């Protein structure tokens, strides 16, 4: 009987979860990247939130909060212009960036898959990193 009840409940929970963009708060160091969706049109603004999803402060080497957008092959397409000052995110704090899909050379991105990455450090100077993949469609 328990299996008959728990099966549909587990299925409903899995159906509601978005594997790419879960925001789960955890004990210890953790960082999350959240976008409003996974699929974007060409030249559509992409709002990117970097969230300290852990319980300890995170430190970043500059005011870009370690944000990098690359192709799946690792080629760098975008990183925000940022002051070279150490930046910190307290637990549950977030910072928002908007990418208009303009690349570092001034041209616009093409359709394809892009990886959004952030990298910071916990109080013990251990690297804390997260990445998500988005699609840019015609």
Model-predicted regions and their roles:
Residues 1-13:
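Hydrophobic membrane-insertion alpha-helices, especially the h-region
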Residues 42-46:
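Structural beta-strand segments of beta-rich domains
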Residues 35-36, 83-89, 104-106, 123:
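Beta-strand-rich interaction surfaces with strong enrichment in secreted/lumenal proteins
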Residues 103-138:
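Terminal connector regions
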